[in-house]
């Protein structure tokens, strides 16, 4: 495919937007899904004052801006800001003219119908794209792992889902959503560090905590055992240097933080952990396909990046499943971007080319065409 009509792949997450060209093995642009507006108009005089900033630029000017995330728990809640993020994606990050390309977008499982229509409408009417398609994030992650049947545990910044998929199609009745993800774990780690005497309060300091989380946290295979080890020795302690040069020591917080994925009660939530949610999702599926799901549990998203998460998942799921069941957890190293990678693979398949919704079809049928062509 010539560069000029290469499809664009845009994966809009609650925390990060991943964008690039179909056929590439990783996204060209990865930036925070946020829009910032000046708190006071007047301060900004002479700064070539824009009325809004997107992504990294908003992040770096956060001191004088009010920041908003237009995607909450995986679902778009503010369309004006979402449009700004897409505009930024095409024109500033990828530097392409959207009207020259087909665009593959991703959506959360159980995304409301009206939302899919709105996405479709904005793509065709605001950006005049040649063609577009909306794919379910978890399905793309499964494709990226080279499978068409399996259950995906997708956990990002804003939301986690367990999505059983059979022969390439998600089974909506068995999809479960868990409002517990990366942002909650960052908040929880902040609380744990405060107990240790390190206070992180501003939004800028939360970014530091996120970095500590990503660099030092891991999932314990046996939580009680690990707590005992941490109490009696300093072998689990690690140090972290803050931007101002201060060095802090982190101990049992390293595994207490992601433990909340398995024990949401730590956060005061009354929901099931990721192992029970995965099990419950499988149990909502037909008896005949459960074996295939148990042996193809695919982890996806940034909040599945903790070392030790796959072994723990295997242990906890084995405890819930029938005794003879073969369980296999697949944790691809690139799983942080596997939704985007799956989109890149799908959009470059020759068999996919007839699946696009074209401008002509949109003009004939309107936004509801998306329900007929994307499922």
From Swiss-Prot:
One GO molecular-function entry: hydrolase activity
| Enzyme class name | hydrolase
| InterPro entries in the cross-refs | Actin, Actin/actin-like_CS, Actin_CS, ATPase_NBD
According to its UniProt entry, what is the function of this protein? Actins are highly conserved proteins that are involved in various types of cell motility and are ubiquitously expressed in all eukaryotic cells.
Q: Which GO terms describe its cellular component?
A: cytoplasm; cytoskeleton
Protein EC: 3.6.4.-
Q: Where in the cell is it found?
A: Cytoplasm, Cytoskeleton
Give the record's keywords alphabetically.
Answer: ATP-binding, Cytoplasm, Cytoskeleton, Hydrolase, Nucleotide-binding
Q: Which domain of life is it from?
A: Eukaryota
Organism per entry? Echinococcus granulosus
Q: What is its main location?
A: cytoplasm
Per its record, how is this protein called by name? Actin-1
What the entry lists under CDD domains is as follows: ASKHA_NBD_actin
């Amino acid at each position: 495919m010539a560069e000029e009509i290469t499809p664009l792949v845009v994966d809009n997450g609650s925390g990060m937007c991943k964008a690039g060209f179909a056929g590439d093995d990783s996204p060209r642009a990865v930036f925070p899904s946020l829009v910032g507006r000046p708190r006071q108009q007047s301060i900004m005089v002479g700064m070539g004052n824009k009325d809004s900033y997107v992504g990294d630029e908003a992040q770096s000017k956060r001191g004088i801006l009010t920041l908003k995330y237009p995607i909450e728990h995986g679902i778009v809640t503010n369309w004006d800001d979402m449009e700004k993020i897409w505009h930024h994606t095409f024109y500033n990050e990828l530097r392409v003219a959207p009207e020259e390309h087909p665009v593959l977008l991703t959506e959360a499982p159980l995304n409301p119908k009206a939302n899919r229509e709105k996405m479709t409408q904005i793509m065709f009417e605001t950006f005049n794209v040649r063609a577009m398609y909306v794919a379910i994030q978890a399905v793309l992650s499964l494709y990226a792992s080279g499978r068409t049947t399996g259950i995906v545990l997708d956990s990002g910044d804003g939301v986690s889902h367990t999505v059983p998929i059979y022969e390439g199609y998600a089974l909506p009745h068995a999809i479960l959503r868990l409002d517990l993800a990366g942002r909650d774990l960052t908040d929880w780690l902040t609380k744990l560090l405060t107990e240790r005497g390190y206070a992180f309060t501003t939004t800028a300091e939360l970014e530091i905590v996120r970095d500590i989380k990503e660099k030092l946290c891991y999932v314990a295979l046996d939580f009680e055992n690990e707590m005992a080890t941490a109490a009696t020795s300093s072998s689990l302690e690690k140090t972290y240097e803050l931007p101002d040069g201060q060095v802090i020591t982190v101990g049992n917080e390293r595994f207490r933080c992601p433990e909340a994925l398995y024990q949401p009660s730590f956060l005061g939530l009354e929901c099931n952990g990721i192992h029970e949610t995965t099990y419950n999702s499988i149990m909502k599926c037909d008896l005949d396909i459960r074996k295939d799901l148990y042996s193809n549990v695919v982890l996806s998203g940034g909040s599945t990046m903790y070392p030790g998460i796959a072994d723990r998942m295997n242990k906890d799921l084995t405890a819930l499943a029938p005794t003879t069941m073969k369980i296999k957890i697949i944790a691809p190293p690139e799983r942080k971007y596997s939704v985007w990678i799956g989109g890149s693979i799908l959009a470059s398949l020759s068999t996919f080319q007839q699946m696009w919704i074209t401008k002509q079809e949109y003009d004939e049928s309107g936004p509801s065409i998306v329900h007929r062509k994307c499922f």
